[in-house]
Every structure is written in structure tokens, then in C-alpha cells.
A protein has these predicted regions:
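Bacterial N-terminal signal peptides
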Residues: 8-17
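Bacterial N-terminal signal peptides that target proteins for export
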Residues: 1-8
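N-terminal leader/targeting pre-sequences
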Residues: 17-65, 70-172
């Protein structure tokens, strides 16, 4: 009888804990340069109703556009960033622009650096998720050498990887 009571109470308490577990509302990737590069910065992802607000601040770039994607693995251990794998694409869609309805979940388009090599980007996205099976948390953000042409499959012809950062849950 005591065992049944204990198991019932334990099940009840676990249910309360799981019900009260909060989904993340903010995530961050701190970008570190790959070998031979000086690109660094941060990208925050903040949940707001039915979308995610993306804010990126990146330095050390050459002036112009640079491809900017979420990649499939949260692994920046290789000196060239290739350990992050390909684009994060849980729904198996074609590569495309960030405003396209059919695109990789990791397609963020381009950041554009000014003459001093700094880029700032702010936009909102309805495809990305901070929780669930298609969550971006635990994956990596990569900044590329060239502009993403938004059409070449599967990567947008964006060239080498200049910086990598793993997306983790941030303090709200």
C-alpha cells in the first residue's frame, strides 16, 4: 500500500514539474572566428508571440553581403567550421530566401557589412522555433565568406565559413 501511494505521489509531482517546465523564450549564439579569420559577434533569437526576432551584430567582415545560416550540428570544433554540417533543414525543403515560405529552417539570407566591417541585422521569422523537434537550439550559426544568392542548391553558393557559434538557451 505504501509503495502504491509513493509511486502515485511521485507520478503526480513529476507531472507538475513537466507541466511547469517553461519553453525557452530567448537563445544566443556567440560567434567565434574560424582559422585565419577575425569575424566575431553574437546573434540573439527572441520569441515574440508567433515569431522569432533575430538580432545579429558581427564584426571583422569584408564590406558587402555575407551568407548567414543555421547549420545542422551544434559543433564548431573544426578549425574551418565544417563540423557544423550543412544547413539545418528538418522539413527537407529547398534552399531559399529568408522570406520564402518554402525554405530551410536555417536559411537566414545575408548580413551586410559596412566599410568598417560591421554588420547589424534585425528581422522577425515565423519558420524558426526555440523548442520542439525543429528547434534551432543546439545547432550552429555560420557566417560565410560570400553572399548567399538565395537560389543555388543546397547552400546558396556562399563560400567558406568565417565564423561559427552554437545556439544555446539564454537568460530571458
Amino acid at each position: 500500500m505504501k509503495t502504491k501511494f509513493f509511486l502515485g505521489a511521485l507520478t503526480f509531482l513529476l507531472g507538475i514539474c513537466l507541466t511547469n517546465a517553461q519553453e525557452p523564450t530567448k537563445a544566443i549564439a556567440v560567434l567565434h572566428p574560424t582559422a585565419g579569420n577575425t569575424v566575431a559577434g553574437s546573434v540573439t533569437f527572441t520569441k515574440s508571440s508567433d515569431e522569432i526576432k533575430v538580432v545579429a551584430d558581427i564584426t571583422g567582415l569584408t564590406p558587402g553581403k555575407h551568407g548567414f545560416h543555421i547549420h545542422e550540428f551544434g559543433d564548431c570544433s573544426s578549425s574551418d567550421g565544417n563540423s557544423a554540417g550543412g544547413h539545418f533543414n528538418p522539413t527537407r525543403k529547398a534552399h531559399g530566401a529568408p522570406d520564402a515560405s518554402d525554405r530551410h529552417a536555417g536559411d537566414l539570407g545575408n548580413v551586410e557589412a559596412d566599410a568598417s566591417g560591421k554588420a547589424h541585422l534585425e528581422w522577425s521569422d515565423k519558420v524558426m522555433k526555440l523548442s520542439g523537434a525543429d528547434s534551432i537550439v543546439g545547432h550552429a550559426v555560420i557566417v560565410h565568406e560570400k553572399a548567399d544568392d538565395l537560389k543555388t542548391q543546397p547552400t546558396g553558393n556562399a563560400g567558406g565559413r568565417l565564423a561559427c557559434g552554437v545556439i544555446g538557451v539564454a537568460k530571458p
